[in-house]
Structure formats: structure tokens, C-alpha cells
UniProtKB/Swiss-Prot annotation:
Pfam families: 30K_MP_core. InterPro entries: 30K_MP_core. It comes from Mirafiori lettuce virus (isolate Lettuce/Netherlands/LS301-O) (MiLV). This is Uncharacterized 55 kDa protein.
């Protein structure tokens, strides 16, 4: 039975996002026990797990303690910030985590490599790759993927005064591009080493399916001596955008991992407990609790109103949408002014082969307000240095000086907006009228529409939902229309 497409059947965080749970395996870490010194805990074991190689090291399970922590809710823990009130983004993020995280900790990770000299830094730790996230996605495979958001809750459990002013850096990296001795950093965020933080990373471009294993995410501490390092846990929630097709959401538990750094106390059970920690946190934020809840309700309401008219599709199998990985062949059309810009050339205007190959399905932009809603594919995208035709807007992009085939006609536009729910190009009705390419928009009895000039049909449109799409045509006019 198909689910209803009505927005009321979806929570705010389910809109056009895919939350992914990935199992992190500790085999590689356990095999590198020779890198761990006597003062470390090595690989922290899960519930009832025993490793003979680490008998001399203390171990602890957070399964029981997590019940107390989750009962209070990540929303409450998120309020433990010393520097003023939380931002709206943090409040919304905390709300999502409160609903998403339930039960025991899913997985536990320790650094694969440790440098044991007190003057050295902790080596950068790779938590996982984009390929491991995509492998957990349900449904069919897509030609492009990107990490829309990687949400992180970082909470240090132990830290000395020497960690004051120091930081831990979480990052997403592209290992296919080398800069010096390391990989190119796509996105990174710093957090105080000894304070709780809620941060967010994103990957600003689509990556072809064959290359997603090159996109890595991890963390690193910098300039912190052994005696000042923190012992902390991190919650990760992944939102993956597949190509440009909206998909329904199947909620998954986020990953929780424990950063086990060198100076962890030898016996965590006698030093502190999660239950005690939660109690202390509750006392610290009691005064902020009312204000926090009011702000959270306000932003949830704003988000719900903003997304109330967004389109939804159900499960991949039932959606009726399909992304072909084989582009239709097209020929370049020579004119006196040069060569037309075809589908094959469009990715050259966009960062990292962002898939825009359906220009014949462009949307007629009549100025409807729902054309300008938040678009998760486009927020945060950076302008490519070599892509002079691409100009970044707040919720859309402008591609300037483009020649495209709309229906049966070629048209040279000074500017085309690239935005909206499905990431189709937006062709401005106002621009077409001002350029005297068309003068009338008429709706027909069968529900379709036409753009006319002096009574002659120039473009045919199909009406889908609240917007109109240019009909595809195999015929091509010899005339080049210019804005």
C-alpha cells in the first residue's frame, strides 16, 4: 500500500532528506593494538564484548548508561553551551536528534593510529567513506550522490585544563585530490576540545557513483599534548541527497561513536558516570529550558510552513521516477555566432559534474512563491573558479549566457535560474515577455498551456502540480530566438 503524499504525514526532518545508518566495523582498529600504549584504553568494547589482546586495558559498556542519557534527550544536552544562547540552526538540529536517537549506542570506534609522544598531535582519524553510507541506502542505485548534511554532536566526557582553547576538527575530504601530504578538504568545522558542541558539515557537490569511495570523513585534534586530550563521544546523523530526484524517508538510527584518546582515565566507572553527567547537565540548563523549548517550537512551525507546499514522492520502487545513466546523444548545432550549448556541455558550468541534463524539461517560472523554497541540493554549493557562467544565489543559481533548446525552438537567454524542488532550470516568463519572444500565456481545456506571440504558438507546456514544464520536441527550429 502506498503512503499518502500529503505533507502532514511527514515530519520536518523527513522532507527531501535521507537519514542513513552505517555500521562501523572495528576489525582494523583491533588489529593495530601495537600502536596503543599502556595508558590508553584501546578499542572500547561493546556490550558483553571481550578481546583477549586488550585484557590489560580497562573496558566499559555504555549500553546501560545510554538509557539515562537518552531519557533526558539530546535536546537537553545540547543546551550545555557556555557562550550565550543557541542559534536557531542548533535548536532545530537538537530537536531532530532528540527524536532520532533512541536505545543503546550502535557502534564504538577508536582511532586507528596514535602517536604516543607527548609533544605530538593525534593523527587524523578516518571514520568512514561516502561509499559506506551509500551502501546502506534502500532502493535503486543513482549516478550521483552528495552528503547534504553530516550532523555532529560532540560531547567531551573528560578533559584537563590544558585542553582549554584547543580544538577538535571534523572534516569531509576528497582523497582523489592531493594537497601537500594530505587530501583536499571539502568541508570542515572546529569544535572546542573540552566543551559540548553541535556542528554540521556538508559536501557541496555531487559525486559520480564510481568515485564516492574517495570522499572520506573523520576528525583530528591539533596541538594538544597527551595530558590535555579529551575522551568524548560523537553522534553522527547523515542526510544523503541522491541525484536530483526527491525520495521518501525511512528513518534510521544515527551512528554514535566514542573517541577514545590517549589520556582516558584508567577506570571510567569510578571516575564518573553518564548518569551523574546527565544530572549535572540538567542542573546547568534548567533556567534555559523554557526559553529553549519556546524557540524550538517557533522554528519547527516556521519550517513546517516553509515546506507545506513542497512535493513528495513515495518509495523508490513506486515513485515512477527513473534516472537514466545513459544520456541521449545530441548533435552540436553550428550557427554564425558559434556552437550551441548542449546537454553535454552544461556540467562544465557547474561544480563537480552536477547533473543537469534535462533542459528540455525546464520549468516556466511565473513568479509563483513555491519556486523559491529552500532547495537542499543548492544551499552551500560553491562557485567553481573556472565556471564563469555560474553565479550563486541564496536558494538558486544563475547560469548566464546560455543557449538551450526549449520544445521545438532554440533560445539564447541572458540568464537562466537553476533551482526548485527537482532542480530543473527555471525559464522566466517575465524575461520571455520583455524580450518579445512571447506575449501571451494561455491555458487550454485539456489542462495544458501554450506560450504565444501574435496568436502563434511558440512553446507548448504541460501542467504538473503547481507549475508548468516545457514539452519536449524532436523538431528544431532554424531560427535562434534571442532575449
Amino acid at each position: 500500500m502506498q503512503n499518502s503524499f500529503h505533507p502532514n504525514n511527514f515530519t520536518i526532518k523527513e522532507i527531501n532528506l535521507v537519514k542513513v545508518n552505517t555500521k562501523i566495523v572495528n576489525k582494523k582498529m583491533a588489529s593495530q593494538s601495537n600502536l596503543v600504549s599502556r595508558g590508553t584504553s584501546g578499542v572500547i568494547k561493546g556490550k558483553n564484548e571481550q578481546k583477549s589482546n586488550f585484557k590489560h586495558l580497562s573496558s566499559v559498556s555504555f549500553s546501560k548508561a545510554s538509557d539515562d542519557m537518552m531519557q533526558e534527550g539530546i535536546t537537553i544536552l545540547a543546551s550545555m553551551r557556555s557562550e550565550g544562547p543557541l542559534s536557531p540552526e542548533i535548536e532545530c538540529m537538537a530537536s531532530e536528534f532528540k527524536d532520532a536517537i533512541q536505545g543503546d549506542i550502535n557502534s564504538v570506534v577508536s582511532p586507528m593510529k596514535l602517536r604516543l609522544h607527548k609533544s605530538e598531535d593525534t593523527s587524523k582519524v578516518k571514520i568512514g567513506t561516502m561509499a559506506s553510507l551509500v551502501a546502506a541506502l534502500p532502493g535503486q542505485s543513482y549516478p550521483f550522490y552528495r552528503i547534504d548534511r553530516l550532523k555532529i554532536i560532540y560531547m567531551p566526557l573528560f578533559s584537563s585544563d590544558l585542553a582549554e582553547g584547543k580544538k577538535i576538527t571534523f572534516s569531509i575530504n576528497d582523497s582523489s585530490v592531493r594537497i601537500g601530504h594530505g587530501s583536499k578538504t571539502i568541508s570542515k568545522t572546529d569544535a572546542p576540545l573540552n566543551r559540548m558542541s553541535m556542528i554540521e558539515l556538508h559536501s557541496p557537490f555531487f559525486v559520480p557513483k564510481d568515485n564516492i569511495k574517495m570522499i572520506e570523513f573523520g576528525y583530528k585534534t591539533t596541538g594538544v599534548p597527551v595530558s590535555g586530550r579529551a575522551f568524548a563521544f560523537v553522534c553522527l546523523a547523515f542526510y544523503i541527497q541522491r541525484d536530483f530526484i526527491p525520495v521518501s524517508i525511512k528513518k534510521k538510527d544515527p551512528i554514535i561513536l566514542l573517541i577514545d584518546d590517549i589520556d582516558r582515565p584508567s577506570d571510567i566507572n569510578t571516575t564518573s558516570s553518564m548518569k551523574k553527567l546527565v544530572g549535572e547537565v540538567n542542573k546547568r540548563i534548567e533556567k534555559k529550558k523554557g526559553k529553549f523549548n519556546e524557540s524550538m517550537i517557533k522554528y519547527e512551525k516556521d519550517l513546517e510552513e516553509r515546506n507545506s507546499r513542497m512535493a513528495f514522492v513515495d518509495n523508490d520502487q513506486d515513485s515512477g521516477f527513473h534516472v537514466s545513466e545513459k544520456a541521449e546523444p545530441s548533435k552540436m548545432k553550428d550557427t554564425l555566432e558559434g556552437v550551441h550549448l548542449m546537454e553535454e556541455n552544461i556540467p562544465d558550468y557547474l561544480p563537480r559534474r552536477l547533473p543537469v541534463y534535462n533542459w528540455e524539461g525546464a520549468i516556466l517560472d511565473t513568479g509563483a512563491p513555491d519556486h523559491w523554497f529552500y532547495n537542499p541540493n543548492l544551499i552551500g554549493l560553491q562557485e567553481d573558479i573556472d565556471s564563469v557562467g555560474l553565479i550563486e544565489g541564496r536558494t538558486f543559481y544563475r547560469v548566464r549566457g546560455v543557449e538551450v533548446k526549449l520544445g521545438a525552438h532554440w533560445i539564447r537567454m541572458k540568464e537562466i535560474l537553476y533551482a526548485r524542488k527537482r532542480d530543473m532550470p527555471l525559464i522566466s516568463y517575465m524575461r520571455l515577455c520583455r524580450a518579445k519572444i512571447v506575449d501571451t500565456l494561455k491555458t487550454l481545456e485539456d489542462g495544458s498551456a501554450v506560450l504565444c506571440k501574435n496568436g502563434k504558438v511558440i512553446f507548448e507546456l504541460t501542467c504538473t502540480g503547481s507549475y508548468m514544464v516545457f514539452k519536449k520536441s524532436g523538431d528544431t527550429s532554424r531560427e535562434m530566438m534571442t532575449e
